[in-house]
Amino acid sequence: GEIGEGAMATHSAKKMQGKSIRKFRDRYRIPIPDDEVESAPFYRPPEDSAEIKYLRERRSALGGYLPTRREIAPALPIPDLEIFEPLLAGSGEREISTTMAFVRILTLLLRDKKIAKHIVPIVPDEARTFGMEGLFRTIGIYSSLGQLYDPVDADQVMFYREDKKGQILQEGISEAGAFASWTAAATSYSSHGIQMIPFYIYYSMFGFQRIGDLAWAAADMQARGFLLGGTAGRTTLAGEGLQHQDGHSHLAASTIPNCIAYDPCYAYELAVIVHEGLRRMYQDNEKVFYYVTLMNENNVHPQ
């Protein structure tokens, strides 16, 4: 109240004095008599008071007095490794990148009727760089309001399609916002009792180096999901400058004990890593999350 409003009080002030304490007591109607107020005794409202009743009701609604981790989400029916047979078989004479391989993996998982609805693809703004625009048409970009405009590429097959039932979270140039969405989906097994499988793909240089503290917080929350560091390596996107040349995100990832990190070279390796991650996190309920770096250099991939 007026004892502090507009006052330039120094941070070295450790306690309130007599007059100030009385004004504070009167403002908040704390029933402490004048002869005791200067000693600032603790005050606890009676058990039948409106304040205590309110506090107990709110605490009960939140699940109790001590923090607990709810384990009520059922395990998901993860498909067999054979679902990725097109990738396990190699690329023949065709040259592809591991980024392209990942998009094929994601597409195959989205065709599986048992887990498709649990998958949450997340991109900040680089979906076209990763070749994911085909998903715009098949599953759509989530928008609570739907599509309110005609996109400039509306005449193309893979146009920018927003939908109230869309599945992709296209977050714009906001790695922190995109990672917040990933964390929400990655912890939904506990907070909502629903297993979600978030795949957040981004330029790897803009991951742990930019939102590493949020990744640590997600690890503390026992998040489960996949982080995909695209355009990884120091030879990628050199024309856009050093800010895209990541050669050290795995060092940052290694500081988080429950972050399982891989830097695969071939599509069959990536398929096995993703399948193993799905099994560990969504069948065995292990408290881990995966970080996988992806390249955009094209190579022939063996079986």
Task: Cite the ranges covered by each PLM segment.
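Short, conserved loop/turn and helix-capping segments at secondary-structure boundaries
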Residues: 11-18, 243, 247
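Thiamine diphosphate
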Residues: 40-302
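Conserved P-loop NTPase catalytic core
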Residues: 13-45
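Conserved RecA-like P-loop NTPase helicase motor core
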Residues: 2-4
